[in-house]
Every structure is written in structure tokens, then in C-alpha cells.
Amino acid sequence: VSKIFFSGIGGSGVSAIASFMADKGHIVVGSDRSFDDNPAHPVYNILKSKNVSIVPQDGSGLDSSFDFVVFSTAVEADQPEVIKARRIGIPMQTRPEYLAKIVTGFKTIAVAGTSGKSTTAGMLAFIMQRLGMRPNFIGGGRVKQFKTEHNAGNAIAGDSDRLVIEACESDGTIIDYKPEHSIILNLELDHHSVEKTAAMFEILGGNTSGMIILNSDDAHLEKVP
């Protein structure tokens, strides 16, 4: 069991991983400025229902008892928790970096592409669940069928070794994912040039141990060797 601090825990990507790790039995503590401003935030209540401790985002809740800290990429370098984590020597990683580590512990299906990732990853996890495959799921969007009083719909903790993730190329960490299977939906000018994104998709394909499924109707995906 790990003791994990999530800074920026209210965002869709970070809250998904925090919820997932709490459901897997880990000790989860987090902070978010949106919770400081609005304690009635719906994600706040869902996390609290999972026994996640929420603290002010001023560094006061962070100490050396934590195994590591996961930061949202929206958290600034001069934020109090970043400064304190560096000062007391707690290992630090961004949300995408931590997701890449989680991927290695499962037979992961990574859903990539410049659009449609959230929808496709959610649909795939839902279909797998209905088929009795008991999948794990960490997404960016919220799946209506997964929403409950205790679940925002962006993650489920199944009891199988299968994990479905949304693999975003925006910050470049997609090249660190090593999934079993990959699905690449499309390729358009988005966060990066078509050529740069194609190069990242090529690396993802090289890191994929099993099948790679590409949309053959997308002309830009022809740029992915």
C-alpha cells in the first residue's frame, strides 16, 4: 500500500487516477484550489466518499510520510506544494508520468488520437464491463454508465489485469506508455504539428507489445510508419 499525495486532484485526469488508486486500497490525500474556493464541488464529495483526505493547497498537508507526490500539469512551479516537496525531498512526478507507470502493471489497451479518445476509451471499457471482463479504466471523460454517488465516471477499478486508458499526446508523455495493445483513431493538427504527432504515435506503436489498430480511413495516419 502506497501513501500518495495528489496536487490538483480536482481535475478530470488527476481525479481519475486518485479515485482509481483509492479504490485499489492505497492511502490518497490531495488538494485543489477549486475545492478551496468551493467545498461543495461535486468531485470533492465523491473523493471524500472514497476516504480520500482533502487538504488546503498551501503545503500544510504535505509531509515526509508520503511515498511520492503526483502533480497536475496545471500546477505552477512556484506553487507551495511544489516548493515543499522539493525542500523535504519527496519524489515528484506529473500525472502523465505516473499514468505511464500504472500502465506497466496491467495488460493495457491505450486509446490514442487527436480526437475521440475519451469517447472511444469509455465505450471500450463499458463494452468490456458488460461482457464480464471486469476491466480497469482510467479516462479523461466521464462515462454516464459508470457514474454513481461514489464515482464521477472517469475511472473504474476492476479485479482483472486489463486496463483501458486514454493516451493523450498533448504533453508528449505518450511516448512513455508501454501498452499491450494500442488503438490510434485519427491524426490532425492539434497540440502539435501533424508530423510531430505522427512521430509520437510511431513511438507508441513501437512500445506496443501486441496489436496496433489504426483508422485506415484517416489519410494523415499514413504518415505513421
Segment roles from a protein language model:
Residues F20-K24, G61-L62, T73-P225:
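Phosphate-binding loop of NTP-binding sites
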Residues V1-T94, Y98, A219:
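N-terminal leader/targeting and accessory segments in enzymes
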